[in-house]
Amino acid sequence: SEMKEIYLDRTEKNNSKWLELITDALKTSKRFEIHCWNEETDWIEFALKYGTLKESTWRYGKVIEGDVTPEFVTMILEMPKPTDIEIYNKMTPFFNIFLDDIKFQSCHYGTEIYIEDEMV
């Protein structure tokens, strides 16, 4: 199926548009995957409270997977917008968040979103 692409750039003052999109996707999602760079140790540790390490061929990072639980949803939706926005205007501290494999993809800290067309 087709993927719809949405880009959130520097003009976004907050992450409300990102939150709106992921809130919708979380309602029907069963599983999540979070990708963090190896040096993002705090976020890896944090994500591991909600899932487990997945075997991955990505040498430069870690992949955490788990069930979309009410606790996970709350964590994602209540996470404040990051303030380290020099490189990316980050919407989330997590590099990638995938829901139900690739049905919903929040990439590059939420600056690029891909949504399966049925969901739009």
Model-derived features: where do they sit?
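Structured alpha/beta or helical-core interaction and ligand-binding surfaces enriched in interleaved
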Residues: 1-120
